[in-house]
């Protein structure tokens, strides 16, 4: 839902603005042209930001010094959140860095598009709503043992969207 709101807002503000053409440029010139275009688009979009607030389970976290990215999942989907120490404060950022995969967070901020093109939320306030008692497995490895998947069905439903979709469809049929 957040993605569709942002894309409609972006289309309204940027209109028919063409993508930057890098044909005939060397790698350095192309990179500079793409960065300049990104900065211009970001400046236009930052004039009227879309503020959002949402809650969900943290499924993935990348900490990079003073800033972090995390994926937050709820019933409707996943969205990436950008959390910087400058935006939320030193104490809140230190608490966030100690958090685990599976914790449930409430995030308030504004929507933006990263340089890689992914729609994200720049967090201005991060609240831990519920601490995960059991740390979830890593995103890339997940649960590989079949017996463990059946014994810890709740973890499999959280980690694998395909399993969750099958479960929901089966429940609707019955």
Predicted region positions:
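Class II aminoacyl-tRNA synthetase catalytic cores and aaRS-like
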Residues: 1-174
């Amino acid at each position: 839902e957040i993605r569709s709101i942002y894309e409609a807002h972006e289309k309204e503000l940027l209109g028919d603005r063409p993508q930057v053409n890098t044909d005939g440029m060397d790698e350095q010139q192309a990179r500079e042209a793409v960065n300049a275009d990104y900065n211009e688009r970001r400046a236009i979009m930052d004039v009227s930001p879309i503020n959002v607030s949402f809650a969900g389970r943290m499924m993935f976290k990348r900490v990079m010094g003073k800033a972090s990215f995390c994926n937050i999942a709820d019933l409707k989907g996943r969205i990436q959140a950008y959390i910087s120490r400058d935006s939320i404060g030193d104490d809140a950022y230190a608490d966030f860095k100690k958090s685990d995969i599976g914790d449930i967070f409430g995030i308030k901020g504004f929507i933006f598009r990263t340089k890689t093109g992914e729609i994200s939320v720049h967090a201005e306030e991060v609240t831990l709503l519920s601490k995960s008692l059991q740390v979830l497995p890593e995103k890339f490895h997940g649960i590989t043992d079949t017996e463990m998947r059946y014994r810890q069905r709740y973890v499999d439903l959280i980690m694998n969207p395909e399993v969750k979709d099958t479960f929901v469809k089966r429940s609707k049929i019955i």
